[in-house]
Amino acid sequence: MLLLVGAISGTCFAQDGNTMKTFDPAFAHTVYFWFKNPGDTDGRARFESSLKKFLKNSKYAKTDFIGIPPKATRDVVDDSYTYSLIVTFDSAESQENYQNEEAHLLFIEECKDLWERVVVYDSFGL
């Protein structure tokens, strides 16, 4: 019985080794985007497509997370942004190189007309 439970659990949580990445705690780059027109579905689709293409082609980004805010239920939670992005790097130098790489610059050029505000928080891991 335990063997069966273990086999089922392993199957449920297994991930494709080609797509699984290990979170790199050395340097995290967290970006929040506020769109001019957050309800623009065409703009959102263009942003998501361009962002995913950029992250796939980045030479420096180790792991990434793209998110949207859940409806806040507490006063301390800010749900005013349109998208969040968390990207990890193996060093601050890699993050600096990422800022100037072609894939990143192309993403900015393709999508800069969509946002009215961008806020970045960079952090070193402890």
What is each of the regions a protein language model found here?
Residues 84, 101, 117-118:
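Surface-exposed loop/turn and secondary-structure junction residues enriched for glycine/proline
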Residues 1-9:
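Bacterial N-terminal signal peptides
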Residues 96-100, 108-111, 115:
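Short, exposed beta-strand-loop hairpins at the edges of beta-sheets
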Residues 110-126:
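Charge-dense polyanion-binding interfaces
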Residues 10-82, 86, 90-97, 123-126:
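Short S/T/G/P-rich N-terminal loop/turn motif that feeds into the first structured element of a domain
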